[in-house]
Every structure is written in C-alpha cells, then in structure tokens.
A protein has these predicted regions:
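N-terminal Rossmann-like or analogous alpha/beta NTP/dinucleotide-binding catalytic cores
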Residues: 2-142
Length: 142
C-alpha cells in the first residue's frame, strides 16, 4: 500500500485539498515586524484572570507591531461548554477595549481567515494531515 492509498483510506471523502485551502487563505501581506496573534479561549464559563492576561498580551503585541489580533473560540470541549460563555468572553474583552480584528460572533464573521470556531476547522486540518501522510511526513504513534 502506498502512502497515497493510506491517506485515501483514512480520509476518503474530503471535499477540498491543501491547494484549495492555501488559495483560500493566502499568506498575509504583513510588513516586517507585524505580528498576528490569537486568543483562543474555551467557552466553558467566565473569563478568568489568566485568560484575560493572555488576551491583553496578545492584543498589545499585535497592535504595537501594526499587526492583527484575532479571536478563535476553542469549542472542542463540548462536555464543559457553557451556552453563554462566548457572549461573556466578548463582553469582557469589549469592556476593556480589547476588540479583535478578526472573529466570529453571533453569526457574523469578521476577517478572511475563518472559520474562527475551532470545531468548524476540522476539514482544513484533515486536508493537511492527509497531505502529510501522502508525502510520508505523518507520524506513526504507537
């Protein structure tokens, strides 16, 4: 069995490949020194001081460099997810003037590199995993 055969066996029905995603999400046109930072909270309740500190640090790094600060909700912990947590996170950030440049909130997508909800990015990751298997760069964990 070839690596391509294995990749096709594991991911038989992917709608898009790596080339598609790389054309959809081209490299950002950043000036030298500009940073792209991400705050990726899990929507499992109120924002705590550690999360706020990370958001503030990421925001300041991005803004001081002329870069981009984005919010991506890490909604993969479905057992502990709290319905209103995303609203609580956004309202806390906005209360302190930390407004993401890119985000997804209440059905609105702001930015060109979404989805900004982790669980909605699965197909992107699967395409890259499939490519790594095809070119024999995937790791076999035992």
């Amino acid at each position: 069995m070839t690596n391509k055969d294995l990749a096709d066996l594991i991911f038989p029905n992917l709608e898009h490949d790596v080339d598609y995603y790389e054309s959809l999400y081209p490299e950002r046109e950043l000036k030298e020194g500009e940073k792209v930072t991400r705050f990726a909270p899990s929507p499992t309740g109120y924002m705590h001081i550690g999360g706020f500190y990370q958001a503030l640090t990421d925001y300041v790094l991005a803004k001081n460099s002329g870069g981009i600060f984005y919010l991506r909700n890490e909604d993969t912990d479905k057992l502990r997810e709290v319905d209103s947590a995303v609203e609580l996170i956004m309202s806390t950030l906005r209360e302190y003037g930390i407004v993401p440049d890119e985000y997804e909130y209440k059905g609105e997508i702001v930015g060109n590199y979404g989805p900004y909800i982790q669980s909605e990015r699965k197909d992107i990751y699967h395409a890259y995993i499939k490519k790594l298997i095809e070119i024999a760069k995937g790791q076999n964990v035992k």
